[in-house]
From Swiss-Prot:
This is Flagellar brake protein YcgR 2. One of its GO terms (cellular component) is bacterial-type flagellum basal body. One of its GO terms (biological process) is regulation of bacterial-type flagellum-dependent cell motility by regulation of motor speed. The gene is ycgR2. Monomer. Interacts with the flagellar basal bodies.
Length: 257
């Protein structure tokens, strides 16, 4: 039987106080949580587990999204491994590639994985996945690209393909020379983002990272990193679905080690 994934009220409050402002970066969709944990598996990243004044260093070994559970390696100290199953809560922390991943779960049970001691636990209901310099980004489709369209301040129009996407912003790629003169801090108002089957969003974009690149043929292109000035709730939920689906597709195409 899958253990109850609901957070006790006092534990939820403690977790919220600990993470504070980072709550804006919380992942709550079970599929996205599973994707984040699978990235720890693929990267063989070390994870610290804290419980009852103890700590072990482990790795996530397997993620079962269908049954909402995951498996992690046993620690190197027998006493800690013996104490872990009776812990009221387990706090996991990792820093893969500068991205802070943190979550809390409960009721770990001893198991075996590939014939070696391990633990199994329910997927967390909330996972905080925070990249210090920018949100976690996914590449957008190449064959059926997403499109950003709008108008310059002088009234001229633009229509550009998205290079990547995150909950915090987008990157645009273009040969349009007008984008070469746009400075950091420029705001593009009411930009329409055509996101394939997810529909269209209208958001204001602030240019934060403009740069030039050269193609293999030596042609000049402009890559414009933009952040969303604001993301209303419905827009953020749509972006979450897009990021989840794109990353899930990418993971499905990545060979498992």
């Amino acid at each position: 039987m899958i253990a109850d994934l609901s957070l006790d009220a006092d534990v939820a409050e403690q977790t919220q106080q600990t993470l504070g402002a980072d709550s804006n970066f919380a992942q709550r969709h079970p599929l996205q949580i599973a994707v984040c944990l699978r990235q720890l598996v693929a990267g063989q990243d070390f994870v610290t587990v804290e419980f009852g004044g103890r700590q072990i260093v482990t790795q996530i070994l397997d993620v079962d999204s269908r049954n909402a559970r995951f498996v992690f390696d046993a620690g190197s100290v027998a006493d800690d491994n013996d104490a872990l199953p009776s812990a009221r809560q387990l706090t996991f922390r990792s820093l893969p590639g500068g991205i802070r991943t943190e979550f809390t779960t409960f009721d770990a049970t001893p198991t075996q994985f590939d014939g070696l001691p391990a633990f199994e636990a329910p997927l967390p209901t909330v996972l905080h996945y925070v990249q210090r310099r920018e949100f976690f980004r996914v590449q957008t489709p190449v064959l059926d690209p997403y499109i950003a369209s709008g108008r310059y301040a002088d009234g001229g129009s633009f229509r550009l393909e998205l290079l990547d996407l995150s909950l915090g912003g987008i990157a645009l790629k273009t040969a349009d020379e007008r984008f070469g003169s746009l400075e950091r801090g420029t705001v593009l108002r009411d930009v329409a983002l055509q996101l394939g089957g997810f529909g269209m969003l209208r958001l204001d974009l602030e240019i934060v990272a403009p740069r030039q690149v050269s193609t293999a043929k030596g042609d000049r292109r402009f890559v414009i990193g933009c952040k969303f000035v604001a993301t209303p709730g419905p827009a953020e939920r749509t972006l979450q679905r897009v990021v989840t689906q794109l990353e899930t597709r990418r993971q499905a195409l990545t060979p498992r080690r």
